[in-house]
């Protein structure tokens, strides 16, 4: 059972790593800001871009990570960070 759980976690980590590796530097910045709880409008202001640009980045991030919500994206990033600490 522990082996299966370990394999499942490894598969999740690999999927996340590929998803994260496919993000552009700007998309990764947006992802970290999303995970900090910032709204699209706030992120746009901080990065000096339009809110529409941020919406496009968020859509691309969700597609690449295979998630549908900001909460799911934040949880995936937290899971990856906790796996990498072990």
PLM-predicted stretches and their roles:
Residues 1-4, 46:
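C-terminal output helix
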Residues 4-33, 86:
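Regulatory hinge/linker segments at domain boundaries
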Residues 5-7, 17, 63-86:
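Basic, Lys/Arg-enriched C-terminal extension of HTH/homeodomain DNA-binding domains
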Residues 12, 23-24, 54, 69, ...:
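Intrinsic low-complexity/disordered segments
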Residues 22, 48-50, 82-84:
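Generic serine detector
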Residues 31-32, 45, 75:
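A cross-family signal for key residues in well-ordered alpha-helices
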Residues 34-38, 77:
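Short helix-to-turn junction characteristic of helix-turn-helix DNA-binding domains
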Residues 37-72:
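Recognition helix of helix-turn-helix DNA-binding domains
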